[in-house]
């Protein structure tokens, strides 16, 4: 939920946008509970206290990112403005293996995926899928190198460092999947995902970061998508959240999913302007999602 345009508008009009209050999981665009409460009454009280804190503080705004739909409705009832976004999620429809999944796609999409995987295989690339204690420090060092390279490729600065990845490797090893691509006996690319298993079975995998130090055609799709899809099928996970941006995910079996955020702006004029903008944007989001569903890659009747 990017608000750079809002911050820019504030700056151009000589109004400070920072500091602002943010309720979110850092660096993690994943929908989940943002108001931690024992019951609905406590949740309402806590949400109201959060809004009151914003109103009484010297901040420009309050932003709650990726709450559950129920929480979004709660913030809406309190007068906050709702914003919608689109992510792409893959759903495991009880697939037994990757070809089982491919069989649900239209012929052209199925053929394209097989061609992409073949290019990587023919280039001599092999893969290691590592979880838990199997992830060594050398693997973290290489992944961190790939992570930094991705940011350099996009002329940006990385937020996380090697020590962060080492730390999560120690504190939550059973929730991490690290894919290492190798060619000629050396690593050339990697992808990191986080997953959680539900108590009753199933679970969700969240794609996070990917990077490469050598170019191989279609390596991104194989490392960051197809290897993770195979893991989901083998592990019995229900969902693979591929994140935002990239209609290319649609052609690979990821369907659009609407996400939510809630916003309060202290400045009356800006609040009114953003409210009108969000009304128009929401209409565009709904039309966009409908169009994406019309072009989904599955055989008709197989969604």
Functional labels for PLM-detected ranges:
Residues 1-303:
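N-acyltransferase acceptor-side catalytic subdomain
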């Amino acid at each position: 939920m990017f608000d750079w345009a809002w911050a820019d508008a504030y700056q151009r009009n000589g109004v400070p946008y920072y500091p602002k209050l943010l309720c979110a999981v850092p660096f993690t665009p994943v929908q989940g509970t943002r108001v931690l409460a024992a019951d609905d009454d406590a949740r309402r009280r806590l949400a109201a206290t959060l809004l009151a804190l914003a109103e009484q503080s010297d901040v420009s705004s309050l932003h709650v990112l990726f709450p559950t739909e129920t929480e979004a409705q709660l913030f809406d009832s309190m007068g906050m403005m709702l914003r919608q976004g689109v992510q792409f999620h893959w759903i495991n429809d009880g697939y037994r293996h990757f070809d089982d999944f491919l069989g649900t796609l239209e012929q052209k999409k199925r053929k394209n995926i097989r061609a992409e995987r073949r290019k990587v295989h023919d280039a001599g690339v092999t893969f290691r899928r590592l979880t838990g204690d199997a992830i060594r420090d050398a693997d973290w060092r290489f992944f961190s190198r790939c992570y930094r390279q991705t940011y350099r490729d996009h002329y940006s600065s990385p937020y996380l460092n090697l020590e962060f990845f080492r730390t999560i490797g120690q504190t939550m090893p059973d929730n991490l999947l690290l894919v290492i691509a190798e060619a000629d006996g050396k690593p050339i690319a990697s992808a990191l995902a986080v997953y959680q298993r539900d108590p009753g079975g199933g679970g969700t995998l969240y794609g996070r970061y990917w990077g490469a130090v050598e170019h191989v055609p279609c390596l991104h799709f194989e490392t960051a998508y197809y290897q993770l899809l195979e893991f989901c099928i083998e592990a019995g996970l229900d969902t693979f959240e591929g994140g935002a941006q990239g209609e290319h995910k649609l052609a690979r079996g990821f369907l659009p999913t609407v996400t939510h955020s809630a916003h309060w702006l202290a400045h009356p004029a800006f609040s009114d302007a953003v409210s009108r903008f969000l009304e128009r944007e929401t209409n565009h989001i709904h039309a966009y999602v409908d169009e994406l569903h019309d072009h989904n890659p599955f055989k008709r009747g197989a969604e």
